[in-house]
């Protein structure tokens, strides 16, 4: 019987749940991050996810997570134990991330940033340097040279910026962030002005940051985009070499499979 892995990317806004086998991440689901949930509510949702994928608890061989929300960790850990009969392994913590962490205080780096950087290096071993750009709650630029995690930059996120603008402006409409054009248009409505301003504004920010990073990283350098808005930004910008929305889930899969080889 094929063993499946349940992978958890526990972020500030959402929990992304991936179902994987040894060779690939097969599918993923996104649930809101809610510290107010109970172990049972999370466990029942996990059973729903598995049922939707045509699986049951007996098909799950391992549960692996990275998290930037410590308050949610024990809830999901207990849910995995009670409903799936599996211990939830965290990276880092239970599973080491084999990168030389050059941060001044290594423990300060978010687990998601390290896992994504590791995944980028494992999936794209050729270039001397890599930049992983994650369009999540924040937009992060994480730099890898060889086997070393150098650090990076943290910028505002697309959705969090849109939410902040909407909450502070009484007359502006809610932003959909849906843009069909490949080039910005001069908006003749507030909605068009906002949507194009956000998508092309973040694309320009990304291009500018990457251009400056290229000036300080030893080349050749390749750029991997991930996160919820990776495809949206990639459609209007040519600054990415690879687009992998599932980059972090791929990293968790690889970390689990290679944990005994190190």
Swiss-Prot record:
It comes from the Bacteria. One of its GO terms (cellular component) is cytoplasm. Its cofactor is NH4(+); K(+). It catalyses: (R)-pantothenate + ATP = (R)-4'-phosphopantothenate + ADP + H(+). K(+) binds at residue 134. Keywords: ATP-binding, Coenzyme A biosynthesis, Cytoplasm, Kinase, Metal-binding, Nucleotide-binding, Potassium, Transferase. It is an enzyme of class 2 (transferase). A monovalent cation. Ammonium or potassium. Its EC number is 2.7.1.33. One of its GO terms (molecular function) is pantothenate kinase activity. Pathway: Cofactor biosynthesis; coenzyme A biosynthesis; CoA from (R)-pantothenate: step 1/5. The keyword Cytoplasm applies. The active site is at residue 112. ATP binds at residues 9-16, 137. It is found in: Cytoplasm. One of its GO terms (biological process) is coenzyme A biosynthetic process. InterPro entries: ATPase_NBD, Type_III_PanK. Substrate binds at residues 103, 110-113, 190. Belongs to the type III pantothenate kinase family. Homodimer. NCBIfam families: baf, PRK13321.1. Catalyzes the phosphorylation of pantothenate (Pan), the first step in CoA biosynthesis. This is Type III pantothenate kinase. It comes from Nitratidesulfovibrio vulgaris (strain DSM 19637 / Miyazaki F) (Desulfovibrio vulgaris).
